[in-house]
């Protein structure tokens, strides 16, 4: 047990030592001679004895005894240095809702809602402040928020809401942008539209008159803000915030005039500059501690305290700390709404494993951390983290609400949490742009009428509540709404004013908890007294309002959210119950609305007497209570008039037998099978206007909302005959060109096949229509498709057959038309390729291309789809396809995959079609032609000749492919195993083999002409009779004889015929056009 020490008196111990020393020395004195010696010895002996006795006394046992004042003198000092884990008096812990140590009665949100500071009885309160000035919280619980020893500006002096001031608040003017100052203008507009801050600035009138800070004639930064606020309230045009702009360096040193800055950064520096300016009013402001500096007006308005609880997962020890904040930075990477961002911010998170040193375990352990609101601020500033780690801006949409409830995030007792902690949106700063380094800032602010305005530099315009909630916000300011937690006798912060300017007595909102069945929205009048009413009269008020509401509708009133239009009597101001949220049409056509957005009204007036001030609870549950129409309508449904609503719905009748010519267009294409197969529409706007013009003559009784005609299919485009063959959609592009060049001999089979496909899904067969009615305008891009109609009888298609017969007849005429035989020249791979005669006239390619583009050809269903299902618009004469076909499909590398990732179809069998296409009509690279084979020359025009030509082409293609394979084996590159021998013969052979494959006789002719022009041996005879030329020709080309399959092959015969022709003098001295060659060969 702690006691105080009681030690015996030192004088008694010294006296005992002297007596003991003197008593021993007195017996030793014997004679007078020895008196002097004995005196000296006695003095030394006395000193030695005193020292020895003092040491013995200091080492003696100490006796203790308890004193009654130990608890007050010692333990109180120890309490200020250590944390009491288990206090002896449980009642010493003071929670919210009760009396704290300073004697102030606080509410559920941490401050006095009644606005009166009350002192509680504390016997030692004055002694604590006098004796322990070094400890501002001598008797407070360590788990509670410490109390400052001095309050610079009481929290109760903050006036919340526009109605707390006697001043009449205007909307405010805009601010002129003086050069990249949109961040400054928007921040100032957001701050000046906070009621608590505006009321404080107006109350600083005495300081404005006596401010001793002379900086450019504008005073301190607080005076500059107050003067700017008064300027925006008094002027009618945009103002220039030069008082703030001139102090930019004083606000923040690194900010440069004319440069873009961050609005939130400027906001933080501006608030700190205002706090410094306020602290300078006190003499010893530098000696004040941090808790006292946080009691400035700016700290009381924006400041709050977060409670951080770190719990050890090993010993469950909880470490509680408090943190002062003036804004909340919310992470929105995983949030889609503001509520989600709050949940993520105040959720429990786990710290790094074994990274927290626990005070109880005295070692590093795993722990969890959670934030909560110890004391909520009056004005909550929220910044959304719209920046990523890589420097980009997060432009995602975050849904907002005009009211938020933070009761579940408050660190209070369950009884105190029952009282709501509600905030209402007062202003915000938005950023427009895709990057955080550039863009434009705007602001949104609320007024005393409850409406919101958008401030874009010097432009000010009203904005609807829905637009405010859907804005890409960056900084938001929410002000505490005390009306939800106010007592019944307390006055309401915002009054109710009618359109004629007369205001009623302010009354508080009915506080309805969640179990209460009745929910009131908007301003209400009490049924009885003026000072207020209890919750028991709420149901009666709702009934009375419902009756008056019906009467007001008959009288022609329009009850809006922010305005009242008085036509006969003053309407009764009230609120809708939750069950009566649906608007009811009035007698004069107007509708009453139960929403709380002022900007949702359709009428705006300059005179502010026409606005109804919305109180703080008028906007409650704004997102929950929205007017819903009686009948749900889809966006695609047309607006039904009164006449249509009374008509009974009748089943839709579809008539196909008798087409009637009307200006109405049929609505068939909107239900086409696919986007690519929709029937073309000539002009959607024109068609729509025609439908509107004749809408009065038609019935509109459908359930899907689409307007119908009288039931007949009148538009030819809706019933145009287009035959779709799905089995032809994967044909190769080159196969398409090859089939378009040759004339089809089996058109009758195609017609039979098409006729079999002309039937409807559910068995309906349409009647044939005339040619004039069924002609549809051609579509230059989209291929036509059979129309699909959805009705109650099922899904069916409409096609016709007359156009097919007409197109077949046209094709037969083209087949029978005589055409000149065109001899295509050699190709890059095959110099002696046989070709087929072209049966097209010079005008045929253009007509054929036009038919293909219009989509009206018979074989349109046979046209393949190139790529990802899109149809190629090019025909056989297209330059791009011709250029691609001239190139080798084999290339110099491995096979190339197609666009859809599958192996190309130009391998194996399709190669025959490629060779056939080359032989058919593309000629050689240099544009010259060769003599075609006898099979092609003797072939006659018509279907028989086409079959013969096709068979010959396929045979030649297979042989050419085999020769190419053999040529590849012969021309393999030397890999070093075989030594190259340089000789004249091998050099010629190598030159021939390394050159372009195939022999070019015309190049040989030109070369021999240059060699033998002045040389001897030839004389004046033609060089064709020179035997050296023939020997050289044979010597150079003998290695190709085996390649052509021997003397019996067709290609060998072609080569020999050409050689004989050249040897007989049939060569050409100059290249001639293709037409002259054909005439000469014929």
UniProtKB/Swiss-Prot annotation:
Record's subcellular location: Nucleus, Nucleolus
Coiled-coil regions listed: none
Q: Which GO terms describe its molecular function?
A: cysteine-type deubiquitinase activity
Positions carrying Phosphoserine are: 514, 516, 672, 674, 747, 779, 785, 841
Compositional bias of type Basic and acidic residues: which residue ranges?
640-649, 729-746
Domain spans labelled USP:
173-481
Q: Does the keyword Protease apply?
A: yes
Q: Where is the active site?
A: 182, 440
**Catalytic reaction equation(s):** Thiol-dependent hydrolysis of ester, thioester, amide, peptide and isopeptide bonds formed by the C-terminal Gly of ubiquitin (a 76-residue protein attached to proteins as an intracellular targeting signal)
Q: What is its EC number?
A: 3.4.19.12
* Keyword list, A-Z: Hydrolase, Nucleus, Phosphoprotein, Protease, Thiol protease, Ubl conjugation pathway
Name the residue ranges with Pro residues bias: 777-786
Keyword Hydrolase present in the record's keywords: the answer is: yes
Record field: compositional bias (Polar residues): 532-542, 701-728, 822-842, 857-882
Show which residues constitute the signal peptide: none
Per UniProt, the ranges with Low complexity bias are 503-518, 588-607, 766-776, 983-995, 1053-1063
Q: Locations of Acidic residues compositional bias?
A: 747-756, 803-816
Q: Which GO terms describe its biological process?
A: germ-line stem cell population maintenance; negative regulation of macroautophagy; protein deubiquitination; proteolysis; regulation of apoptotic process; somatic stem cell population maintenance
**Modified residue annotations for Phosphothreonine:** 658, 662, 782, 823, 844
* One Pfam family matching this protein: UCH
Going by the entry's taxonomy, the superkingdom of the source organism is recorded as: Eukaryota
The function of this protein is: Required for maintaining multiple types of adult stem cells, including male and female germline, epithelial follicle cell and intestinal stem cells. May function as a transcriptional repressor by continually deubiquiting histone H2B at the promoters of genes critical for cellular differentiation, thereby preventing histone H3 'Lys-4' trimethylation (H3K4). Controls selective autophagy activation by ubiquitinated proteins.
Subunit relationships: Interacts with atms/PAF1, but not with CycT.
Q: What does the sequence similarity comment in the record state about its family?
A: Belongs to the peptidase C19 family.
Protein's name according to its UniProt entry: Ubiquitin carboxyl-terminal hydrolase 36
Organism per entry: Drosophila yakuba (Fruit fly)
In the UniProt record, what gene is named as encoding this protein?
A: Usp36
């Amino acid at each position: 047990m702690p006691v105080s020490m009681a030690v015996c008196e030192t004088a008694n111990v010294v006296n005992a030592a002297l007596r003991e020393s003197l008593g021993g020395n007195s017996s030793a004195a014997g004679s007078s001679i020895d008196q002097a010696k004995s005196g000296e010895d006695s003095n030394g002996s006395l000193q030695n004895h005193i020292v020895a006795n003092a040491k013995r006394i200091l080492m003696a046992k100490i006796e203790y005894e308890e004193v009654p004042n130990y608890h007050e003198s010692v333990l109180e000092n120890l309490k200020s240095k250590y944390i009491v884990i288990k206090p002896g008096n449980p009642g010493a812990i003071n929670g919210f809702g009760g009396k704290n140590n300073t004697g102030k009665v606080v509410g559920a949100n941490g401050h006095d809602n009644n606005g009166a500071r009350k002192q509680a009885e504390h016997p030692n309160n004055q002694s604590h402040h006098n004796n322990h000035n070094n400890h501002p919280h001598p008797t407070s619980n360590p788990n509670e928020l410490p109390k400052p020893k001095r309050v610079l500006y009481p929290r109760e002096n903050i006036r919340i809401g526009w109605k707390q001031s006697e001043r009449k608040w205007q909307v405010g003017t805009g601010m002129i942008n003086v050069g990249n100052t949109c961040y400054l203008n928007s921040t100032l507009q957001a701050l000046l539209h906070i009621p608590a801050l505006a009321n404080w600035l107006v109350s600083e009138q005495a300081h404005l008159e006596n401010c001793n800070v002379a900086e450019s004639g504008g005073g301190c930064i607080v005076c500059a803000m107050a003067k700017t606020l008064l300027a925006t309230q008094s002027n009618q045009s945009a103002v220039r915030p030069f008082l703030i702009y001139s102090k930019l360096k004083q606000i923040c040193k690194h900010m440069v005039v004319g440069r873009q800055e961050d609005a939130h950064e400027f906001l933080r520096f501006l608030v700190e500059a205002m706090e410094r300016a306020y602290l300078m009013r006190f003499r010893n402001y530098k000696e004040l501690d941090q808790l006292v500096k946080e009691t400035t007006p700016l700290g009381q308005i924006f400041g709050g305290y977060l409670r951080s609880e770190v719990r050890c997962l090993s010993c469950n020890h909880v470490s509680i700390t408090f943190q002062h904040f003036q804004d909340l930075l919310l992470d929105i990477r995983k949030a889609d709404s503001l509520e989600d961002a709050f949940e993520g911010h105040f959720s429990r998170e786990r710290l790094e494993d074994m990274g927290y040193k626990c005070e109880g375990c005295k070692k590093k352990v795993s722990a969890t951390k959670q934030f909560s609101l110890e004391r909520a601020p009056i004005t909550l500033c929220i910044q959304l983290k719209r920046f990523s780690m890589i420097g980009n801006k997060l432009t995602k949409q975050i849904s907002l609400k005009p009211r938020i409830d933070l009761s579940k995030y408050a660190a209070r007792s369950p009884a105190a949490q029952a009282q709501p902690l509600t905030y209402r949106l007062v202003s915000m700063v938005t950023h427009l742009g895709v990057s955080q380094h550039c863009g434009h800032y705007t602001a949104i602010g609320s007024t005393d009428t409850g409406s919101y305005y958008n401030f874009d530099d010097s432009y000010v315009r009203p904005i609807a509540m829905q637009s405010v909630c859907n804005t890409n916000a960056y900084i938001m300011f929410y002000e505490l709404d005390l009306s939800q937690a106010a007592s019944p006798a307390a006055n309401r912060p915002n009054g109710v004013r009618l359109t004629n300017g007369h205001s009623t007595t302010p009354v508080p909102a009915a506080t309805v908890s969640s179990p209460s069945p009745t929910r009131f929205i908007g301003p209400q009048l009490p049924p009885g007294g003026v000072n207020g009413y209890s919750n028991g009269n709420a149901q009666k008020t709702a009934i009375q309002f419902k009756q008056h509401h019906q009467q007001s509708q008959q009288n022609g009133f329009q009850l809006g959210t922010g305005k009242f239009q008085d036509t006969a009597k003053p309407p009764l101001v009230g609120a809708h119950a939750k069950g009566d949220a649906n608007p009811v049409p009035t007698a004069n056509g107007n509708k009453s609305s139960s929403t709380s957005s002022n900007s949702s009204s359709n009428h705006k007036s300059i005179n502010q007497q026409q606005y109804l001030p919305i109180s703080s609870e008028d906007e409650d549950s704004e997102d929950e209570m929205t007017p819903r129409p009686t009948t749900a309508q889809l966006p695609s449904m047309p607006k039904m008039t009164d006449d249509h609503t009374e008509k009974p719905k009748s089943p839709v009748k579809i008539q196909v037998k008798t087409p009637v010519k009307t200006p109405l267009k049929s609505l068939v294409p909107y239900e086409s099978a696919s986007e690519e197969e929709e029937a073309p529409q000539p002009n959607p706007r024109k068609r729509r206007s025609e439908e509107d013009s004749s809408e009065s003559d038609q019935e509109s009784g459908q359930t899907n909302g689409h307007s119908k005609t009288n039931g007949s299919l009148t538009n030819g485009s809706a019933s145009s005959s287009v035959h779709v063959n799905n089995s032809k959609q994967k044909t190769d592009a080159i196969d398409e060109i090859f089939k378009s060049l040759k004339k089809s001999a089996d058109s009758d089979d195609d017609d039979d096949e098409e006729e079999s496909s002309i039937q409807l899904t559910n068995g309906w067969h349409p009647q044939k229509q005339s040619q004039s009615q069924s002609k549809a305008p051609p579509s230059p891009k989209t291929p036509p498709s059979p129309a699909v109609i959805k009705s109650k009888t099922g899904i069916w298609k409409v096609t016709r057959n007359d156009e097919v017969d007409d197109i077949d007849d046209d094709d037969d005429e083209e087949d029978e038309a005589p055409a000149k035989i065109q001899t295509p020249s050699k190709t890059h791979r095959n110099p002696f390729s046989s070709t087929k005669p072209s049966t097209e006239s010079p005008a045929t390619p253009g007509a054929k291309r036009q038919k293909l583009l219009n989509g009206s050809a018979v074989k349109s269903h046979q046209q393949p789809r190139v790529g990802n299902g899109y149809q190629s618009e090019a025909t056989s004469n297209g330059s791009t396809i011709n250029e691609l076909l001239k190139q080798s499909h084999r290339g110099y590398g491995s096979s190339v995959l197609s666009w859809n990732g599958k192996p190309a179809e130009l391998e194996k069998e399709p190669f025959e079609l490629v060779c056939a296409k080359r032989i058919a009509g593309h000629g050689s690279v240099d544009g010259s032609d060769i003599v075609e084979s006898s099979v092609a020359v003797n072939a006659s025009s018509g279907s028989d000749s086409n079959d013969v030509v096709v068979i010959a082409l396929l045979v030649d293609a297979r042989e050419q492919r085999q020769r190419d394979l053999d040529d590849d084996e012969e021309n393999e590159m030397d890999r070093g195993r075989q030594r190259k021998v340089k000789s004249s013969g091998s050099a010629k052979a190598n030159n021939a083999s390394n050159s372009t494959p195939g022999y070019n006789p015309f190049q040989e002719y030109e070369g021999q002409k240059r060699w033998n022009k002045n040389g001897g041996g030839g004389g004046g005879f033609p060089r064709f009779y020179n035997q050296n030329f023939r020997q050289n020709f044979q010597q150079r080309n003998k290695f190709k004889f085996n390649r052509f399959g021997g003397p019996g092959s067709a290609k060998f015969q072609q080569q020999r015929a050409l050689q004989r022709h050249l040897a007989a003098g049939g060569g050409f001295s100059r290249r001639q056009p293709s037409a002259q060659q054909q005439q000469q060969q014929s």
